[in-house]
Each structure stands twice: as structure tokens, then as C-alpha cells.
Regions:
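The feature marks helicase ATPase cores and/or their adjacent C-terminal helical subdomains
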Residues: 1-419
Length: 419
């Protein structure tokens, strides 16, 4: 079996090359009955984009599965839990993703498990491999000797300081068969390309017409830039407000845009605020009067006044537990874990990007593209100089047509990633 990998800067067509390579493999080795292509990535946003790419190939939807690595690992652990118990491990809780992946990797060390996986999925595609933690990388390494493995990665797009040096990228380079891509395809705007290249190379990005770095000491000034930009933007374009952290500065800007009008008469504008399921669930639990023991008959009352989709999913779960297992009481910890899983499921099923304006973090914007990008750069950002360059690079490279960086602190403009 072979390992082929594609690496290079953002927007250079790594995922495109993955799909082209997959098409070539399928021509040389058509799938047999019961076989599927397995496409894996770390985050749900990347999974949705990968799923869209797979749907465009001349391959039946029944012949591929697109999943996060965590979901695949959970499926593996559940299927082989008897073996897991026999080697002295209890099945990890559904929300303990790191342990689930570690257990899945340990199971794949057993030949019977690896051969089962290889028979079901003789071709495995992995996107955004630079984000793989050691346990997730171990899953891919166990599969590598038994499947056709196609991988895309870019070490500089890894936003976790804990993954430096990047073991996944080092392993892929050491395996050989790596194609390094350099030609950008996401945008042909010279200013955007030059700014991204400068940040990546540790040099100061230069402002121009389509790329600008602006000092905006207060939320009102930053919001005015964005609100005017939204109004002057062509209808139908996808606009993103991207920030390293959704802190006070970003939230104040978001509120201003949605409630105020600029001196030029622009605004207010509706902005879809994207948050991680962890943040949303934490806020949901804070507002929930959750008892230590929940009676099944009280589940509906507990969900009153809360988002209908989550409330409905939770009460249906309680009803299933009551009907199938005769349960009438649930602990606080069990309820919290179930709600966290429901929020995660909801994020997984969200649709792709459409026209409009959305606010999100750099992490949430990974592997996505927008016509117009505004980057909110707050005064305080954690991490070393390299980390800050990676954050800014990942934000700038989401833009296809224009990007404006709005820095809260003038002092920040005299330090990396701006110098």
C-alpha cells in the first residue's frame, strides 16, 4: 500500500489534488462490493467542505463516508468494545475525544481490527493532517500499511502550539511521496498573496487597496469600518469577520454593527455569530436550572424557554431511555454529557456557507473561504510571535477578494505579526 501526500500554503489546491489523486486511484482500482472510500479530517467545518468535494466526484454517495477522526474512532471503539474490555480498558465516555482516539489507535494495533478496517475502507483520504494530535495520528499510522492513503497538510496552518514540532508533517515527509504545491488558486489578487506570503515568511505585510492594516482603538471605529464595508460590498458576496478570540472587543464590535448606523447611513446589519459547540453548550448549561437528579417526567419542563432543536432532541433521548430501558431518573453529570453530545451533533449537521455576513474565530474559519474578510485583532492575544503569525495568516488566507485587518492596539502594530 502507498502513502501520497500534498503540502503547501493555504489556497494552493491541496484538497483539489487530493480529489484528483482519489479519482486516479479509483480508476486503477475500482471499489468492490462492500468497499468504501473513507475521508477523514479533524474539524466539522473541514469535514463539510471535504464532503462537498467528494459529492462532486463521479462516485456514488453510498461508496464513500466522510467523517471526523473522532467520529470514526468512536465507531471503532463501540464496534470492538469486547476486545477493548479484554485488554483491560473501559470504553471511554463519548465526550472524551482524546481517550477515544487513543483507544481506537490501540485497537488498530491488533491485526484483526486493522484488516477489518482495510477491508471496509481500502482507500483513506485525510485532509488538514497538520491538526492531528498524537493519538489521532496513531490511527492513521496504523492504517497506513494496509490501505491506499492520500493526505493533505500544511504545517504553518496548525494553530496548536502543543503540536510543535508537528509529528504528522514530519511523518508524512519521512514516508516519501510528498508533492509540495506552490501555485495559489484561491485568489489572484497580488496584494492578498503578498500579504499572506509576508506574514508566513516573518516579514511585515504591506497595506494597499485590497489589503489594509488599520488602527482602530475602539469598537465603534472598527465597527464603522466593517459596517461601511458591508454596505459597499456587492450583494451575494460572502463576508466574514474573523478574530483570534471572541472576547470583549469582538463582541462589542458585533453588537455595534447589529444595532448602530454609521455617519454615512450604513447599517445596522445582521451578523451570524458562529461559536463552538463547547461555548454554546457552556452558556446553555449556565442558564439551566439543572437538579442533581432529573426525573424523566420533568424533562419537558426543564427545556421550556430554551432552543427548540436542543430541547426536542433531549426530551426524545429521555423518552427513549424510559421506553427502552425503563429508566426514570438521570444524574446531573449524565444530563450534561448528553447535552454536550447533542450540541456536537447539531454542529456536525450544520449546512455549509452561504451569502451574508458571519462572525467567527480563526479556528472556526479554517478550510473555508469568503469573498471579503475583516480581521479583528484585539489588544491582547496569547502565544509567541510564530503563533501570532499563524493566526493572522490563517485569517488573511480566507479572503478571495479583499481583506482589512483592524487592530485594537496601535502598539500591537509595532510587534509581530505586523513587523
Amino acid at each position: 500500500m502507498t502513502v501520497r501526500s500534498f503540502s503547501g500554503p493555504a489556497g494552493c489546491g491541496k484538497t483539489f489534488q487530493l480529489m484528483a489523486a482519489l479519482s486516479g486511484v479509483l480508476r486503477e482500482r475500482p471499489l468492490q462490493n462492500g468497499e468504501k472510500v473513507l475521508a477523514l479530517t479533524f474539524m466539522h467545518g473541514s469535514r463539510r467542505r471535504l464532503d462537498e468535494r467528494l459529492a462532486a466526484l463521479p462516485i456514488s454517495q453510498s461508496h464513500y463516508e466522510c467523517s471526523t477522526l473522532d467520529s470514526f474512532a468512536w465507531r471503532l471503539v463501540r464496534r470492538w468494545q469486547t476486545l477493548l474490555l479484554s485488554i483491560g480498558h473501559q470504553v471511554a465516555a463519548a465526550a472524551d475525544y482524546e481517550l477515544i482516539c487513543a483507544q481506537a489507535a490501540e485497537l488498530l494495533a491488533h491485526r484483526v481490527v486493522t484488516l477489518w478496517a482495510a477491508c471496509a475502507f481500502p482507500i483513506v483520504v485525510v485532509d488538514e493532517a497538520q491538526d492531528l494530535t498524537p493519538s489521532r495520528l496513531a490511527i492513521i499510522q496504523q492504517l497506513a500499511n494496509h490501505v491506499e492513503l492520500l493526505v493533505a497538510s500544511d504545517e504553518f496552518q496548525c494553530l496548536s502550539e502543543d503540536l510543535r514540532p508537528n509529528r504528522a508533517c514530519e511523518w508524512l515527509t519521512g514516508m516519501g511521496g510528498e508533492m509540495v504545491l506552490a501555485q495559489p488558486w484561491r485568489t489572484n489578487d497580488r496584494e492578498l498573496l503578498a500579504a499572506a506570503r509576508a506574514v508566513r515568511d516573518g516579514e511585515p505585510p504591506q497595506s494597499g487597496r485590497q489589503f489594509k492594516v488599520v488602527s482602530t482603538p475602539n469598537a465603534g471605529m472598527a465597527a464603522t469600518w466593517i459596517s461601511n464595508g458591508i454596505s459597499w460590498n456587492r450583494q451575494g458576496n460572502r463576508v466574514a469577520i474573523i478574530t483570534p478570540t471572541m472576547g470583549d472587543f469582538a463582541r462589542s464590535v458585533h453588537t455595534w454593527i447589529e444595532t448602530r448606523t454609521t455617519t454615512r447611513g450604513n447599517g445596522p446589519h445582521r451578523v451570524l455569530l458562529e461559536e463552538s459547540e463547547v461555548t454554546r453548550c457552556d452558556r446553555f448549561l449556565e442558564g439551566l436550572a439543572l437538579p442533581d437528579e432529573l426525573e424523566a417526567r420533568d424533562a419537558h419542563a426543564l427545556m421550556e424557554g430554551h432552543p427548540r432543536t436542543i430541547g426536542k432532541a433531549f426530551t426524545e433521548w429521555v423518552d427513549r431511555q424510559r421506553r427502552c430501558q425503563g429508566r426514570t431518573e438521570f444524574t446531573r453529570n449524565e444530563v450534561e454529557m448528553t447535552l454536550r453530545q447533542l450540541f456536537s451533533n447539531q454542529r456536525r449537521m450544520n449546512s455549509g456557507d452561504g451569502a451574508g455576513v458571519r462572525a467567527l474565530t480563526v479556528h472556526g474559519a479554517k478550510n473555508r473561504e469568503f469573498d471579503v474578510v475583516f480581521v479583528l485583532w484585539p489588544a491582547a492575544i496569547g502565544g509567541d510571535a510564530v503563533q501570532k503569525r499563524r493566526l493572522l495568516y490563517n485569517a488573511i488566507t480566507r479572503a478571495r477578494r479583499s481583506c482589512v485587518v483592524l487592530a485594537q492596539s496601535t502598539r500591537a502594530l509595532q510587534a509581530p505579526p505586523f513587523v
